[in-house]
């Protein structure tokens, strides 16, 4: 092929001439840089390579990380994992070889990306999120993504989403907003974990989390300040109570002292809030995670106590009485998983009382079929969104739409095994979920999410809207 034939085939002369003319019209001070950027924009970006690797999450357990290559650059994503997996959530693929990371290796998921998913996606337009996600679902051919692994599929889905935003030259949160069909973006109220228990901490506290929500702040930046100050006041309160001794932190960064009762924990948090001076502007939320201490039809609140007497078993009716009492005595606005994950009846009844927001996590598992059932039966009134329980960005957007159409609240959530990826921050803003639950204002994998929200608020400038008092339905 001659030089002229090569130029003609790729229309190089025309493209270069257009770039030069554009530089002249713009009267740019750096025409070479302008021309280079102009030519780069003229190239239709496609996925050219997908490379996965095994990394460690915040607990030292393997997870999947992906580098997705396009003509615009390399886009990285990594996925979190929980302390357990539910029956109705997408399958996290692990090797099961006890000789490798005690059976937790994700080498199979990594291989599936490098050999199968990569081949299927090369040449696709990263802006077409729905098509990319559907291509992986079709390749997997199972209802719960057990063939390729939801951890493999989600890592690629998130990386593609980041690449799509870059191709459009918009922030990731804006790209997600566009994908969801929303006209507005909203900075969420952070639900900071301040006390940890349950499966997330090595203490005697059966309840999984007590959180604070700075709904009275005017901006996310102020909310973050209040959360940090309350957290450190709480640390001081616990130290004083323990005679100057500190305490451990849980997997999500929350403080984890030995606590004998839910009321004791709430009193500690109440005192910390009082010390900040933001009393009426900071509310409390609780993740009961009742499934973890449900034995048959009873709830054992002493399940983690070394000196358990067996006298602290509660029926579902007893639990409802307890919730009524604490919601009357403390500024509690939201309770997550107040009953066992299969106890639809009592969850529905408690929700009907209208005492506070009732969030479904273990009850729903971000599963569209269970969300649909809960909507039809009025079982709860808020969704805890865990993207890794679904497996793709597109499906996450769809389940949020279901919740919003039902006038539910939505809480975007982290997992106990987190990574340095801050995708859920952009997701929460783009989908205007109203609340984000990303752990304590402590530990890098948690603060990474909150710090990203600071950057988003700064980037949005005068257009930034903080959910604040409208945290339930950020419309």
From Swiss-Prot:
Name the encoding gene, please: ENO3
First-listed, main subcellular location of the protein, grouped into a coarse class: cytoplasm
Q: Where does Mg(2+) bind?
A: 287, 336, 361
- Entry GO CC: cytoplasm; cytosol; nucleus; peroxisome; phosphopyruvate hydratase complex
Active site location:
252 (proton donor), 386 (proton acceptor)
Species for this entry:
Arabidopsis thaliana (Mouse-ear cress)
| UniProtKB keywords | Acetylation, Cytoplasm, Glycolysis, Lyase, Magnesium, Metal-binding, Nucleus
On subunit structure and binding partners, the annotation says: Homodimer.
Q: Does the keyword Isomerase apply?
A: no
Involved pathway(s): Carbohydrate degradation; glycolysis; pyruvate from D-glyceraldehyde 3-phosphate: step 4/5
State the protein's name.
Cytosolic enolase 3
> Could you tell me where this protein is found in the cell?
Cytoplasm; Nucleus
Query: What superkingdom does the record give?
Result: Eukaryota
């Amino acid at each position: 092929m001659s030089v002229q034939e090569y130029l003609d085939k790729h229309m190089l002369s025309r493209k270069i001439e257009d770039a030069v003319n554009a530089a002249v019209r713009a009267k740019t001070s750096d025409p070479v840089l302008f021309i280079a950027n102009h030519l780069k924009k003229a190239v239709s970006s496609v996925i050219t390579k997908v490379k996965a690797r095994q990394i460690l999450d915040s607990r030292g357990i393997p997870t999947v990380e992906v580098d997705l290559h396009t003509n615009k650059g390399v886009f990285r994503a990594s996925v979190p994992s929980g302390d357990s997996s539910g029956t109705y959530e997408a399958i996290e693929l692990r090797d099961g070889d006890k000789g490798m990371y005690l059976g937790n290796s994700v080498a199979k998921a990594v291989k599936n990306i490098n050999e199968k998913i990569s081949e299927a996606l090369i040449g696709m337009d990263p802006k077409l999120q729905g098509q990319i996600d559907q291509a992986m679902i079709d390749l997997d051919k199972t209802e719960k993504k057990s063939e390729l692994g939801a951890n493999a599929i989600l890592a690629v889905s998130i990386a593609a989403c980041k690449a799509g935003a870059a191709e459009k030259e918009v922030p990731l949160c804006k790209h997600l907003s566009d994908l969801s069909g929303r006209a507005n973006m909203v900075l969420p109220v952070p639900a900071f974990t301040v006390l940890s228990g349950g499966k997330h901490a090595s203490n005697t506290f059966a309840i999984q989390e007590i959180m604070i929500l700075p709904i009275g702040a005017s901006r996310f930046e102020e909310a973050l300040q209040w959360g940090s100050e309350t957290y450190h006041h709480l640390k001081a309160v616990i130290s004083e109570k323990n005679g100057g001794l500190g305490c451990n932190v849980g997997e999500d960064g929350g403080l984890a002292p030995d606590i004998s009762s839910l009321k004791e924990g709430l009193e500690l948090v109440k005192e910390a809030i009082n010390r900040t001076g933001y009393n009426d502007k900071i509310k409390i939320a609780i993740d009961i995670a009742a499934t973890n201490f449900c034995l048959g039809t009873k709830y054992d609140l002493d399940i983690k106590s070394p000196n358990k007497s067996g006298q602290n078993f509660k029926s579902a009716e007893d639990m409802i009485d307890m919730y009524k009492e604490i919601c009357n005595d403390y500024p509690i606005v939201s309770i997550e998983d107040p009953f066992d994950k299969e106890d639809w009846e009592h969850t529905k009844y408690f929700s009907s009382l209208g005492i506070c927001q009732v969030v479904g996590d273990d009850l729903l598992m971000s599963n569209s079929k269970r969300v649909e059932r809960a909507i039809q039966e009025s079982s709860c009134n808020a969704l805890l969104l865990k993207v890794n329980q679904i497996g793709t960005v597109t499906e996450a957007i769809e389940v949020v739409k279901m919740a919003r159409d039902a006038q539910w609240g939505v809480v975007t959530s982290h997992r106990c095994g987190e990574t340095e990826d801050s995708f859920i921050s952009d997701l929460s803003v783009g989908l205007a979920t109203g609340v984000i639950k990303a752990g304590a204002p402590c530990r890098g994998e948690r603060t990474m999410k909150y710090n990203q929200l600071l950057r988003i608020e700064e980037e949005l400038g005068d257009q930034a809207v903080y959910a604040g008092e409208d945290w339930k339905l950020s419309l």
